[in-house]
């Protein structure tokens, strides 16, 4: 029963991404709809676009748009190019100082003077210099353009009941893992945007609880099996690290109990997603 959670095949990863799209669309689809519909044919920059699936989901119902997606992971860009015919996809890193000069020639080719929407979904937590990156992005905004920042803050994350403290331990494991990014990024977004020169900063959404979903198992499917795969791979990559071995074995031994918790009527799980817009 446990072994089926110890790896994610390509098909399972595709399924996880579909779940992620469904969950996050439920979380803040209205924010994106309002931003996209401010202009008849919005020019959109999707920062950290990955395979492009999330943005394509958000753009459903938008008749006309111009899209450029950027990601520093070349493999993801190759997938986006093969999967989506609408839009341009580039291997670029927004944290590089020359990012604006690198993307402007492509903007000119696409007839884009400035972006009406710049989307940063789950990327600021991984930035070394968020203010610098956001400042560069601001120079690419069109007049009256909007930046959308969706990120996470584990201070908003909780699970209850948690008598065995399994979820408490899991949250601590995530917070102590530098490769997971800044797990308290969400509370800093307003300050980052202010220092980067943005105005009219608004916080639209705070926290996504399982009680707001028709099927709260979606939150389990979104996060938990993928994390187990991550901890397994980290252990396999560094087998001599006893702490990482211990983390993986604990996760492996407790994942079924965590799933059982999600299936209980009185259980609630909250993920710390946040959504800001600024101009």
Question: What do these predicted regions represent?
Answer:
Residues 2-27:
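Class I SAM-dependent methyltransferase Rossmann-like catalytic core
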Residues 22-41, 57:
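Conserved alpha-helix/loop element of class I SAM-dependent methyltransferases that forms part
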Residues 45, 51-102:
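Class I SAM-dependent methyltransferase SAM/SAH-binding core
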Residues 119:
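A conserved beta-strand element that flanks and buttresses the S-adenosyl-L-methionine
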Residues 125-127:
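A short His-aromatic
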Residues 131-146:
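A short glycine-rich, Lys/Arg-flanked "PGG" loop and its adjoining helix->strand segment in the class I
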Residues 148-221, 225, 229-230:
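Conserved catalytic/acceptor-binding region of the Class I
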Residues 202-279:
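Conserved Class I S-adenosyl-L-methionine
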